[in-house]
């Protein structure tokens, strides 16, 4: 390691877990490419965080060991927000609106970044869900698209310089 260099390289490394299915499944690969792009935009500003690393590692292992699920990346992003410090405040989740900008529920529509009705119901379904519960989530493709759009917007509102995710278009074409 040379602190004066911007680009570092590995001389040798050893894999802790050998992936078995992700590289053989185009849908899984598309999701991983999407998540890699999102993580590359986020982690560049992060300090060492072993819990975050463990979360990412466990999520990838889970995804590799289980069959494809079209909700994995959405649940991943919501749970990732816990480690980034802006997980939604689930107090008052009985309210009519969720304010994406401020991260809380409200009965007052006083922001340009409010979700409600079907979008809010879908959003509520994924809060508190872990990967083992993915099988219980059923959303239509339109609901899934809207939910992912809202989560990406949520990230843009909470992470400075979070730009558009280019691989999102590819992901949408896959499923």
Segments predicted by a language model, with ranges:
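Non-catalytic alpha-helical scaffolds and adjoining flexible linkers that form interface surfaces
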Residues: 1-175
């Amino acid at each position: 390691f040379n602190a004066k260099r911007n680009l570092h390289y590995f001389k040798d490394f050893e894999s802790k877990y050998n992936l078995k299915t992700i590289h053989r499944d185009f849908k899984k690969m598309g999701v991983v490419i999407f998540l890699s792009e999102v993580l590359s935009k986020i982690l560049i500003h992060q300090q060492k965080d072993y819990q975050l690393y463990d979360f990412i590692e466990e999520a990838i292992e889970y995804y590799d060991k289980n069959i494809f699920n079209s909700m994995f990346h959405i649940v991943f992003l919501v749970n990732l927000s816990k480690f980034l410090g802006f997980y939604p405040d689930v107090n008052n989740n009985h309210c009519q609106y969720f304010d994406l900008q401020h991260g809380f529920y409200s009965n007052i529509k006083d922001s340009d970044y409010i979700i409600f009705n079907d979008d809010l119901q879908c959003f509520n379904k994924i809060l508190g869900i872990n990967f083992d519960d993915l099988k219980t989530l059923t959303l239509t493709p339109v609901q899934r698209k809207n939910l992912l759009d809202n989560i990406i917007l949520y990230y843009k509102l909470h992470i400075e310089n979070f730009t558009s995710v280019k691989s999102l278009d590819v992901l949408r074409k896959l499923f």
